[in-house]
């Protein structure tokens, strides 16, 4: 195609900007939708209506399907397995595919290619690098005299996916004994800021929370020896770069959201206290409710008891033996 445009949630704009071959990015906001729904819809429709030869939608929500239908006469979209929800979408769309909750997100997202007669590579491409960001990170590491390091990413987008403070501190004290620098990464949001002010002061631990842009973090991840931390965007960036990963999972279901192995072209499927495939090790609690797929216990969006049942010593043992 001559040009590829994106329509994304504004919360994902920073990572969307790292994708190659994109001309422009349109955004929508749940906050703006709640404040003035029709104003946002009007602006989006004016921007996309019949502006494209082809539209591809990777989710099955009614709203996103309507955007795809409005953007192009030739539209492809995910639809639900439940025909009571999907019937009208199947009628109106040029092509459709089933969004499979039991398949990895990468596999789901590649399905439109087969509808276009293209062979998909089951490969998670890494984000493009910014030369300026790469130089900035190299200078920062040089000033701190850091040559080899592992990233520890303790935060996530939601509280229910964050490791308990006491357990996190215990893990940091253990990591501090390794003969390699540990860089703690994070952004500037409320969750990250709260973690930043509570970090223990340790000789081999370097706090980079709030100090890197997404472009700089991608470079930092590329230069690292590996990733330790929660199941979040940063983990998937590390997976795309084929880094050694030690991921701490709470209620998130593995079959869709576990780190993708480019070498094996697969991901984790079943819940286990510890499992390793290729360069990836995943830790989960040994509890019958794992993984529930809910937003924390009782779906409260705050706390996941399973995360409090993953031993820092167990995590450290795997890292130390590596």
PLM features: residue spans?
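Catalytic machinery of carbohydrate-active enzymes
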Residues: 1-322
């Amino acid at each position: 195609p001559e040009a590829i445009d994106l329509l994304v949630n504004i919360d994902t704009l920073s990572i969307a900007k790292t994708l190659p071959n994109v001309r422009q990015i349109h955004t929508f906001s749940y906050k703006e939708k709640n404040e003035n729904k029709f104003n946002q819809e009007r602006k989006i429709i004016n921007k996309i209506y019949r502006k494209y030869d082809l539209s591809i939608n990777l989710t099955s929500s009614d709203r996103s399907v309507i955007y795809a239908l409005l953007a192009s006469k030739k539209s492809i979209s995910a639809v639900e397995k439940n025909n009571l929800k999907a019937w009208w979408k199947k009628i109106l769309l040029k092509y459709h595919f089933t969004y499979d909750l039991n398949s990895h997100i990468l596999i789901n997202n590649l399905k439109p290619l087969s509808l276009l007669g293209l062979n998909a590579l089951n490969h998670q491409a890494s984000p493009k690098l910014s030369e300026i960001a790469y130089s900035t990170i190299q200078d920062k590491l040089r000033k701190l005299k850091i040559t080899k390091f592992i990233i520890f990413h303790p935060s996530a987008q939601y509280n229910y996916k964050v490791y308990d403070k006491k357990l996190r501190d215990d893990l940091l004290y253990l990591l501090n004994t390794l003969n390699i620098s540990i860089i703690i990464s994070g952004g500037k949001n409320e969750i990250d800021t709260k973690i930043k002010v509570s970090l223990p002061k340790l000789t081999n631990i370097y706090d980079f929370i709030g100090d890197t842009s997404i472009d700089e973090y991608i470079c930092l991840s590329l230069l690292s020896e590996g990733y330790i931390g929660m199941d979040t965007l940063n983990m998937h960036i590390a997976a795309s770069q084929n880094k050694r990963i030690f991921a701490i999972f709470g209620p998130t279901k593995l079959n869709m959201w576990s780190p993708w192995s480019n070498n094996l072209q697969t991901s984790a499927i079943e819940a286990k206290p510890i499992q390793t495939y290729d360069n990836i090790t995943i830790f989960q609690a040994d509890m019958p409710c794992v993984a529930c797929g809910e937003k924390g216990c009782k779906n409260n969006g705050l706390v996941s008891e399973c995360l409090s049942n993953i031993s820092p010593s167990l995590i450290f043992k795997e890292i130390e033996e590596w």
